Structures are given as structure tokens and as C-alpha cells.
Amino acid sequence: MRFGLNIDHIVTLREVRKTYEPEILEALFIAKNTHKVDLITIHLREDKRHIQNEDVLRLLEISPLPINIECSINAHITDFLCSLKNKPSKVTIVPENRNEVTTEGGLDCSLKGLGETIKAYQNKGIEVSLFIDPLEDALHFAREHQVKQVEFHTGVYANLHNALYSNANNQIHAISALKEKSPKELKEELHNAFLQLRKMSKEAFFMGIMVCAGHGLNYSNVKELLKIPSLRELNIGHSVISKAVLVGLEKAILEMAQLIKR
């Protein structure tokens, strides 16, 4: 299993104070020196709430690890990434809403301009991945546009798992809709969410599409996904950076790697 470490929230902490620390390159090399991280993931958002263009340039210039850049189909971002001398190893196209706290679901594949954006990156020799819900129509869209990788949105699975097996439902930011469900309902919906991820991962595999997954994954809910044989890559960020605040980045990475690289 490939481990993609999302380091957006290293930069979130920097941007809160508009200062120079923590240094994103230091985080990069801590990750590299664990020998457990396979790629670095960053999200270049339209509102630049964390990662900035300058961060992209610095990372691509010196990173010993492949860089996966998540972004919307915004034309300015597409033009910027396509113009780079040092190219990312892949671009993952994600939906984006300026009012969201984090990405809320997979891409709407009927989105105007999506096909053109995919082609723009492909014409520059940049691998494209689509961040999609585990749905058959989305997979067929990927295949029709010669997309060789997809990343399944695991938010539904992760939220259900957290509601059932952690104290998430008792926290200040608990999801209201999940608080109203019984443990039996949560368990059934979680089982169905897992089965859907497994089914669509298998279908993607037979289409010749590499399957990645991410969103909301943490030290508790990630283990079940290892039972999906066609799943090749997990992109995880917030939970690792959250633990790093308490135990240090190296230890947080190693603990996650121990779970997913068995």
C-alpha cells in the first residue's frame, strides 16, 4: 500500500500567523527520512487558505518524493500548474467550494470544463487522477477520458466509522445527521459504505484504473480498508498532523505507516 502524506495543515498553522514557521520543507524531509512515505500530497486551493503558489514551486524544485497536487478546475490554477518547469508527479482534480471547511464529496463529472482540464494536464505529460465518489458512472467517465488513476472519497465511510467506534458523536463538531442514528443503523450504513468502496475498487481494477482513496481517514478507521485488495494508495493528512502536534511528526508518520504497510 502506498502512503501519501498530505501536509496542508503544516501550512495551515503557518498561515494562521502569516509567519515563516512551521517550515514546509522541514516537514517534507522528516517524511522522507522515515522511509515510509511514498508521496507528498498538497491541495492548492483557489482561496489559498493554506498552500501558496510559492510552496508549490519550492516543493517541486527540491522534493525527493513525488508530489501529488490536488486542485479544482479553476483556469488560473490549471494554467499555473501546466506552465511549471518542474512538473508534479500527478494532479488530482477535486471539487471545491470556497465556503467548505474541507472537501465535501467527489467530483460532479458533468462539471463544465472538466474534460478540457483533464486534457490540458495530459497534453503536458502530467498524470491525472480524479477525486470521485465510489460510483460506476464516475468510473466510466474516468475511463472515457483516459484517466489512469482515481481517488475514492472515503468521507462517508470515515464519518460512519468515527460515529460508531469513537466519541465523535459527543464532540463539539459532531455531525448532526449521524447523532440521530442508532448504533444498528450506523453499523448497517458503514457496512454498505465499505462494500461500495470494495465493489467499485474491483471494477476500477478490471478497467485498468489504479485505485487510491482518501478523506477523513485516521488511525482507527484506516485498517478496514486494507481488506480491499485492489486499493493501491491512501492519502492521509489531518489525522497525522493532529497527532504530530502531540507526539511529533516523525512518530505520527511511523505509527500510521505501521498500520497501512503490513
Swiss-Prot record:
Compartment(s) where it occurs, according to its Swiss-Prot or TrEMBL record = Cytoplasm
Q: Which Gene3D superfamilies match?
A: Aldolase class I
| Binding-site positions, 3-amino-2-oxopropyl phosphate | 6, 17, 216, 237-238
EC category: transferase
User: GO molecular-function annotation terms?
Assistant: pyridoxine 5'-phosphate synthase activity
State the Pfam families in the record. Answer: PdxJ
Q: Which UniProt keywords apply?
A: Cytoplasm, Pyridoxine biosynthesis, Transferase
Q: In which pathway does it act?
A: Cofactor biosynthesis; pyridoxine 5'-phosphate biosynthesis; pyridoxine 5'-phosphate from D-erythrose 4-phosphate: step 5/5
User: Where is the site labelled Transition state stabilizer?
Assistant: 151
Q: EC number(s) on record?
A: 2.6.99.2
Please classify the protein's predominant subcellular localization into one broad category: cytoplasm
Query: So where's the catalytic machinery, residue-wise?
Result: 43, 70, 215
Give the catalytic activity: 3-amino-2-oxopropyl phosphate + 1-deoxy-D-xylulose 5-phosphate = pyridoxine 5'-phosphate + phosphate + 2 H2O + H(+)
Read off the CDD domains from this record.
PNPsynthase
Residue numbers binding 1-deoxy-D-xylulose 5-phosphate: 8-9, 45, 50, 102
Q: Name one GO cellular component term.
A: cytosol
Q: Which family does it belong to?
A: Belongs to the PNP synthase family.
Q: What is the role of the protein in this entry?
A: Catalyzes the complicated ring closure reaction between the two acyclic compounds 1-deoxy-D-xylulose-5-phosphate (DXP) and 3-amino-2-oxopropyl phosphate (1-amino-acetone-3-phosphate or AAP) to form pyridoxine 5'-phosphate (PNP) and inorganic phosphate.
Q: What is this protein called?
A: Pyridoxine 5'-phosphate synthase
* Gene encoding the protein: pdxJ
